[in-house]
Amino acid sequence: MTSSAPLILLAAGGTGGHLFPAEALGVELIKRGYRVRLVTDARALRYSGLFTKDMIDVVPSETVRSRSPVALARTALLLGTGTLAAFNLMRRLKPAAVIGFGGYPTVPPLLAARLAGVPSLIHDANAVLGRANRFLSAHVKAIATSLPGVLDRDPALSGKTTTVGTPMRPAILEAAAVPYAAPETAGPLRLLVVGGSQGARVMSDVVPGAIERLEPALWSRLVLTQQVRQEDMARVRAVYDRLKINAELQPFFTDLPARLAANHLVISRSGAGTVAELAAIGRPSILVPLPGAIDQDQYANAGVLSDANAAIRIVQSDFTSDRLASEISALAAEPVRLAAMAQAARAAGRLDAAERLADLVIKTAGL
């Protein structure tokens, strides 16, 4: 790769669900001899991975958090400032194409690309198009989705939409090579509980009580790994210590792909990235969609796996310690069912998404 190689700008919100697919595409484009840079917000600076600080451009941005006139005016001002900064970035870097991965931090660079005449496209990993991508969809040349049928009911957009899957970073592809081995009847049952990049308090509220309600014979089998917010750590640990559960508690896992592969059952939120990774690696799950979302994207995401009999979807209002204990007990008693769920999850996964998306980027850029 030389300094004269075409440059592709990757725009993503500053959370793992947006950054990880961007990273996976970046790896593939670099393999093909292209240069890449990331345009994002300040949150991305704390993530390690492909994008070092000298490969990241931070532009002003704001998420629509309120419909009040003052909040909307502030958001519009910041997005306008960000678009101007991104336009200057386009003039300086002269990218061959810009691709957005969702989140409001992608709005300024994608609008700037349109103003600068730079070919652009978006990728959406959700079963429902996100709000930022929905806004941008009319302004880009191409749309890539992880799942089929996302825009089938929108003739104006479906004609420029291609289903490619969710690009997987190298660590996920490595984990996907680990076959699923169902737990033996009296052997260890490895349970992983995660709640997204920030952790989910509901897991700390519900899971310890569910473990306490299991038959004592199952306590000795459990090997539990749980993501717990620091402020919840003491109360969660106290329950597991009292029950003598073999438990590892951490506020964040830097090696989550390997941990997904090492466990028999995963309890998690159903963000697009999590659902795609569970499918790619092929692991059974109990999914608890984040409530309150305007477009109910996590509910739809979880449905992709629950409809395939690869996961159990529980809405948060039904996610009680009693319900969870019942589900864990039933699955622990049916290792054959766990194996079938793992197989169904793997069948729903797609491991070549980064290659397919790279092909679309190159085609859109006319390279």
Swiss-Prot record:
UniProt EC number: 2.4.1.227
Enzyme superclass (EC): transferase
Tree of life domain: Bacteria
Listed GO biological process terms: carbohydrate metabolic process; cell division; cell wall organization; lipid glycosylation; peptidoglycan biosynthetic process; regulation of cell shape
Residues that coordinate or bind UDP-N-acetyl-alpha-D-glucosamine: T15, G16, G17, N126, R169, S197, Q298
Keyword set, alphabetical order: Cell cycle, Cell division, Cell inner membrane, Cell membrane, Cell shape, Cell wall biogenesis/degradation, Glycosyltransferase, Membrane, Peptidoglycan synthesis, Transferase
Pfam families on file: Glyco_tran_28_C, Glyco_transf_28
Segments traversing the membrane: none
Catalytic activity: di-trans,octa-cis-undecaprenyl diphospho-N-acetyl-alpha-D-muramoyl-L-alanyl-D-glutamyl-meso-2,6-diaminopimeloyl-D-alanyl-D-alanine + UDP-N-acetyl-alpha-D-glucosamine = di-trans,octa-cis-undecaprenyl diphospho-[N-acetyl-alpha-D-glucosaminyl-(1->4)]-N-acetyl-alpha-D-muramoyl-L-alanyl-D-glutamyl-meso-2,6-diaminopimeloyl-D-alanyl-D-alanine + UDP + H(+)
Membrane topology designation: Peripheral membrane protein
Localization annotation: Cell inner membrane
GO annotations of cellular component type: plasma membrane
Pathway the protein takes part in: Cell wall biogenesis; peptidoglycan biosynthesis
GO molecular function, one term: undecaprenyldiphospho-muramoylpentapeptide beta-N-acetylglucosaminyltransferase activity
Family the entry assigns: Belongs to the glycosyltransferase 28 family. MurG subfamily.
Described function: Cell wall formation. Catalyzes the transfer of a GlcNAc subunit on undecaprenyl-pyrophosphoryl-MurNAc-pentapeptide (lipid intermediate I) to form undecaprenyl-pyrophosphoryl-MurNAc-(pentapeptide)GlcNAc (lipid intermediate II).
Protein's recorded name: UDP-N-acetylglucosamine--N-acetylmuramyl-(pentapeptide) pyrophosphoryl-undecaprenol N-acetylglucosamine transferase
Species the sequence originates in: Bradyrhizobium sp. (strain BTAi1 / ATCC BAA-1182)
Gene name of the encoded protein: murG
